[in-house]
């Protein structure tokens, strides 16, 4: 294929011509979705929603809702299996938890009221009984009380899902009188503040362009932004730091945002202990030295120091301020400390002066204290394609975290990353990937009719077909983890406004199909109707997950699930790629951010001057205040059944490191449009450029974290993936075994400490052919464990 046929744009952003050839994409023409899976999804969507009363006109106004289980609420065919049957309730609960136990009385058919997770066609209610039709008109006179009750029932209309019910609304004469005037006044004030904020940001932009950036420094910045590879960017960033005098700041140890004296003392102690331990091991005198009473060996001193200092943000060494004063790097003392911690951890892992059990205990405690790193990809419709550049920059430097979470559009990118290997991703993250982005291809004559009739612009079934390629077919969260080792997390919000959100991953919903979770996380009201999560059963077929409840866009309530990640995976360092257009406009760091310092007054000034930064901060806080007032006073209406104030009032939109790619005005015009090759190439380039300044900070963090994970991996015995030992720690297993022996046997049957140490030093490998133990080897010499 020639370059003209490939259609390379005028500005290639550093990509070779092959990057614009879609035929070179892995699995380009492969359709992963099976017809049976798509049919199961269609049937799940057509099933009635069990969380809402039926509104199909088939239920009697005087009959209770679908949740009341009177004997007159079921047809004769459904009367054999009532929901109060313990077996039925247990079966439904198991299905909600991801199990596939058969439901008694179903016989491959849902019961009459839509309960259960089967994807077969449901039986709808047509009458209260065979002799009492639902819509039968009663002929005859009514009493005054009956007429009054009938008029009251007519006035009380059914509340649409997501709208405020009578229990949620306030009563009072002043509330009804002042609600709308107060809402209009505050709304007008908010609009005025928003316009003022835009003018303030424009003033700051002009100030920086014509005051802060001019002459030689502007030329150096242009050279830095023109790079497409990280090594080239580092060279340009060093040149800019040298010109601005930032290198002198690195040589000074003192800084208000960390304890420089403690860091200097710990660094020196680590270095001395490591050198002495290496000399002692080389001379082979560790045994004689350890026999001296009242003295500790250097390796023991090193172990104590490591356990004391390898913690999350120890004395402020991971404070983002330490990386916000220069374009590249941090204090020389901090960099030396990170290098020494890495060397000391390596020495503990490779030394022969510690037993394997001691090493295992050390790295287990250090891992719990240090925590993990997660990459969080926000929503943002077509703005989410900037995430490709962020992922590409991290991938090329081998800094892609194992824990990845995505919401809405970010969930689509996260699904691609979590289901592909590094080699596959390097071939996929190119501009030709735009040929697989066809979700918005329909003309206005098609989608407008759909929106008018269904209330949604896009079709859920069509999106399921396209999304299945990004998730490598009907792959579940557990299957993705087993294939790539990455932990995918997708935020989903229930269709009703009061149920809690869920974070789907291989722990909370292992059998949930990824493409269904991505669709649910992208189901913005008015754009895509709420969808049903699907799960994969033991036979490989799909069925509705969690009683067939419907879910919608996760960014409406939890765009960045930092708290859930911390609880489930011990994540305390987050890399957030924030591209939401309604949030990106308000992201402003008046005193600089990681890799992007304030240029004037040697980094001690304010962006746009003090007046510009103060005005920006005041307006932003005032906007937040009035939005909270409207929400707390319950004055905001709920268009499309959603409280839209939560788009701005969530707990956090950023992380330890926040990346916000540089957008342009045309992105807002194409917010619901598919990108072409040229546009996707620019978005990938801007995503990379926004990530390059953060890489040094991320690299220092992941160097230590991955070395700790390596220590845990090499010091644990061989464990088959998916077994109970991979979930429960070794200490917990030992306690369970001891407890079982003490309760079921005599005291002589309890394993002694010596026997336990001998057992922990044994290892075995199960051969694939015979399924027998191939051998047992002693680890007392500190040899590496078999993997």
UniProtKB/Swiss-Prot annotation:
- Mention any Pfam family matching this sequence: DUF3336
The UniProt regions of compositional bias labelled Basic residues, in chain numbering, are 144-157
What EC number(s) does the entry state? Answer: 3.1.1.-
Q: List the GO molecular function terms.
A: triacylglycerol lipase activity
State the CDD domains in the record. Pat_PLPL (cd07232)
Q: Where is the active site?
A: 408, 553
Q: How does it sit in the membrane?
A: Single-pass membrane protein
Record keywords, A-Z: Hydrolase, Lipid degradation, Lipid metabolism, Membrane, Transmembrane, Transmembrane helix
Q: One biological-process term from Gene Ontology?
A: lipid catabolic process
Query: According to the UniProt entry, which residue ranges have a biased composition of type Low complexity?
Result: 59-69
Subcellular location per UniProt equals: Membrane
Q: Does the keyword Hydrolase apply?
A: yes
Q: List the disulfide bonds.
A: none
- At the top of the EC hierarchy, this enzyme's class is hydrolase
Q: Name one GO cellular component term.
A: membrane
Composition bias (Acidic residues) maps to 746-759
Residue positions of motif GXSXG: 406-410
**Residues of the signal peptide:** none
Q: What is this protein called?
A: Patatin-like phospholipase domain-containing protein MGG_12849
Species: Pyricularia oryzae (strain 70-15 / ATCC MYA-4617 / FGSC 8958)
